[in-house]
């Protein structure tokens, strides 16, 4: 701890042999006199200054035990949300359009949304896309669906598992995490965004990310639109932070490169986001090498999803 010396002491001994005093000149303008024999009585102990501010971190975990937000209702489906797991679709409703929780707000003014109130302050609302609010247009959905059975990566029914990851848990052994669907259009206007509900700028230090099962399946096997990954392929996740004055900062992470499955970010991988600086929001998009050009727009071929968990905020 730093100590600030409020009184600077100057000790000036008189040089003449006959002089036996020390004079202490204090910063308040006074002078104190001490005999040489009493010099040990002079105290140089500085008073303690103010403590440096302690920088603390808070973590968005999506765990029910860490839920501090107020109860609210998703009006379009009548679901009361008191804890994070209330935002998780049923395990048998992962297919496109199957869950009223993440699909029934199409052509509606209501939307799936959540906020880490009274903790990190991070919040998310489904973006408006394709005429409404729906996970098929992008969004961040809470999930707890995990498997360690790699047979899923050969299951042609993979589209019924779009909220699953090939792990035995969330990051750091947790139960819940978020799955994000990235609109496949290249340079889309629609963004998957985390915002601070208080409107102030904060530093997002890091988060954990991994590639969900549905994207892994298509990277390994291809589908009707994409090819299996080869040496020239890559999968990248990009974060764009927006500062209070509107300036942007960017950081990215390479989730996969080439066809070496063992090197891909299948396990939870810590991503350092501190270089974004203090931001009021951060948006995410994904990029890959495989692109279809339809003239009016370009689209990535592979269904692009990512999972994230344990977001650390200062």
Regions found by a protein language model. Name each.
Residues 1-23:
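Bacterial Sec-dependent N-terminal signal peptides
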Residues 20-35, 62-66:
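Short N-terminal segments immediately surrounding and downstream of signal-peptide cleavage
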Residues 26-48, 73-82:
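N-terminal targeting signals for Sec/Tat export/insertion, comprising classic cleavable signal peptides
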Residues 41-58, 314:
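Low-complexity, Pro/Thr/Ser/Gly/Ala-rich linker/spacer regions in secreted
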Residues 53-189, 199:
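N-terminal targeting leaders for non-cytosolic proteins
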Residues 60, 64, 232-314:
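Terminal, low-complexity interaction segments
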Residues 199-206, 278-279:
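Extended extracellular/luminal ectodomain segments enriched in beta-structured repeat modules
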Residues 218-237:
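Short coil-to-beta strand junction motifs in C2/discoidin
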């Amino acid at each position: 701890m730093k100590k600030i010396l409020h009184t600077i002491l100057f000790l000036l001994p008189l040089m003449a042999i006959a002089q036996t005093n020390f004079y202490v000149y204090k910063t308040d303008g006074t002078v104190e006199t001490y005999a040489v024999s009493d010099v040990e009585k002079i105290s140089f102990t500085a008073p303690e200054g103010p403590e440096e501010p302690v920088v603390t971190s808070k973590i968005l975990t999506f765990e029910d035990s860490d839920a501090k937000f107020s109860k609210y209702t998703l009006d379009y489906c009548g679901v009361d949300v008191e804890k994070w797991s209330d935002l998780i679709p049923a395990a048998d409703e992962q297919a496109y359009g199957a869950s009223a929780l993440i699909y029934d707000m199409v052509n509606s003014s209501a939307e799936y949304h959540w906020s880490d109130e009274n903790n990190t302050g991070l919040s998310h609302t489904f973006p408006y896309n394709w005429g409404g609010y729906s996970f098929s247009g992008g969004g961040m959905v809470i999930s707890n669906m995990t498997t360690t059975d790699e047979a899923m990566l050969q299951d042609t029914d993979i589209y019924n598992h779009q909220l699953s990851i090939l792990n035995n848990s969330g990051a750091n052994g947790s139960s819940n995490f978020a799955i994000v669907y990235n609109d496949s259009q290249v340079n889309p206007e629609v963004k998957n965004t985390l915002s601070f509900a208080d409107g102030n700028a904060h530093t997002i230090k890091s988060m954990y990310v991994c590639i969900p099962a549905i994207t892994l399946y298509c990277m390994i096997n291809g589908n009707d639109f994409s090819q299996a990954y080869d040496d020239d392929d890559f999968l990248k996740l990009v974060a764009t932070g927006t500062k209070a004055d509107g300036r942007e900062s960017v950081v990215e992470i390479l989730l996969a490169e080439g066809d070496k499955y063992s090197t891909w970010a299948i396990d939870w991988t810590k991503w350092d986001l501190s270089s974004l600086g203090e931001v009021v929001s951060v948006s995410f998009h994904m990029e890959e090498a495989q692109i279809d050009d339809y003239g009016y727009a370009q689209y990535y071929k592979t269904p692009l999803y990512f999972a994230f968990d344990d977001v650390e905020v200062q």
